[in-house]
Amino acid sequence: VVATLSKEQFKEVTYLVESTLSGVQQNSKSNYYASFFDRDSIQQDSKTISCSGRGQTLLFSKDRRDLVLRHYRRGGFFGKLVKDSFFIFEKNAHRAFDEFKLLEYMLSKGLPVPKPVIAREIKGFFSVTQDIVIERLNGYKDLSYVISKRELTETEYTNIGKTISLFFKENILHTDLNIRNILINEEGRVAIIDFDK
């Protein structure tokens, strides 16, 4: 569901939300949707965890759900100049909405990815800033953490290969696949995250 809820100070705020959130009463949608992205309020909660990385990721809980808030930032040299603004004419100007839709599609195909909850775009005259909130995959650790603690089992290696092949079979190519966005749990189940490129 797409909802454009506010236009002020030459900026337009648009949300893409999962169906369960679209049932919020119209007069309270704007504040409710915005609360998912209120970093100051979220960080005041003692249970919130701030993660390192370019995306400024926060792990938090809301409405009895464990969630991940990620702010989209640029990388590379250009990212040092512009940081988190994407020009509206760029190919990747709508990363948050693109990732949201891709996650929904992959879930419909039974692929092991997190569920998208809500995404936001704030548009100015020529640029857009973006955020996304997804459900946290509890019990999973990224591969870089796991291999820093122990060796992988043969079964885990096999499961990683099989999981990646599922995405290839659906013609989905993760352009930044690395050990930080391959997750594994204690049962050896594998999931893939960060489809923002």
Report residues per predicted region.
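Regulatory N- and C-terminal appendages and interdomain linkers associated
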Residues: 1-51, 63-64, 187-191
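Conserved ATP-binding subdomain of kinase catalytic cores across diverse folds
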Residues: 33-141, 165, 169-170
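Generic detector of well-ordered alpha-helical packing
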Residues: 71, 136, 177, 195-197
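AlphaC helix of the protein kinase catalytic domain
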Residues: 142-151
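Conserved alphaE helix
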Residues: 155-163
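Catalytic-loop of the protein kinase fold
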Residues: 172-179
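Catalytic activation segment of kinase domains across protein kinase-like and atypical kinase folds
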Residues: 180-197
